[in-house]
Swiss-Prot record:
Its biological purpose: NDH-1 shuttles electrons from NADH, via FMN and iron-sulfur (Fe-S) centers, to quinones in the respiratory chain. The immediate electron acceptor for the enzyme in this species is believed to be ubiquinone. Couples the redox reaction to proton translocation (for every two electrons transferred, four hydrogen ions are translocated across the cytoplasmic membrane), and thus conserves the redox energy in a proton gradient. This subunit may bind ubiquinone.
Principal location class: membrane
One GO CC term on file: plasma membrane
Chain's gene name: nuoH
Protein name (Swiss-Prot/TrEMBL): NADH-quinone oxidoreductase subunit H
Amino acid sequence: MLELFFEYIFPLIIIALKVVAITTPLILCVAYLTYAERRVIGLMQLRRGPNVVGPFGLLQPIADAVKLLFKEPIIPTNSDKILFILAPMITFILSLIGWAVIPFAKGVVLADINVGVLYILAISSLSVYGIIIAGWASNSKYAFLGAIRSSAQMISYEVSMGLVIITVLLTTGTLNLSEIIEAQRTMPWWIDLMLLPMGVVFFISVLAETNRLPFDLPEAESELVAGYNVEYSSMGFALFFLGEYANMILVSAMTTTFFLGGYLPPFNISWLDCIPGFFWFVFKVGFLLFCFLWIRATLPRYRYDQLMRLGWKVFLPLTLFWVVLVSSVLVYTDNLPSI
């Protein structure tokens, strides 16, 4: 009996504890990211932002959560009720399970699988299904238009994201996220410089992937009232909200892993190795999240045709050209990694 426990049950308990250790701080970070967004945008617009609930408004996310929890969930009469309820749950769950392969520090990762890049690409592609299901199940023209926009936007920018990641794989020679970070430790400076434009393209693409300004066309308030979640209230709305902000943190972690060295110190400065890698990971992700908020506070929304033109006529040819350029340079300089 004891052997059965240690062989089958104990590993499951350890995995469950790891999942709780990752998801609990993540949900807290999502809650306080909403507070940070309101404070940052308030400061940029010369106002104070939330400052009443608790000291410096720090309890505002808790007040918002309690408010949404006790609101009445309203389900439209002619909607597909089962899909209507499932859609926000799908979006939120998918935003959490992507974290399974993200390395927070050296050796600190839930599942260090050899196809981590494929896993995270699959999860990020699936996240649009929750939005499409919500738009269809709501039986509302505004929600349906928002869902169609979201699927078109996802397809447009997923292609360029995939090509950008191919350039990273060409320089590192692995699909394992921990090994990608370790490869950046010894990567020549000129390869880093060559990947820099692709890092910018990747960050702009993930802005579109997460439906954030200036690419928030699926929920454009001036055109679609609130887009795909127009019929949602109470915890359905809260789960969509949490899913969006959890995706923001996830894509910031992806950008950090692929282009900023993950948990490595900036510019591989050796004397900074005394600081734990987790600190550098959080610092880099925090900087990218600030960029998300900064962009929302300063840039207007793109028109839909401009969004499509940028994805298909600018990013797709540029990333294709860059894949050919990077592979040619690596072959010519004999720096192509062995896989």
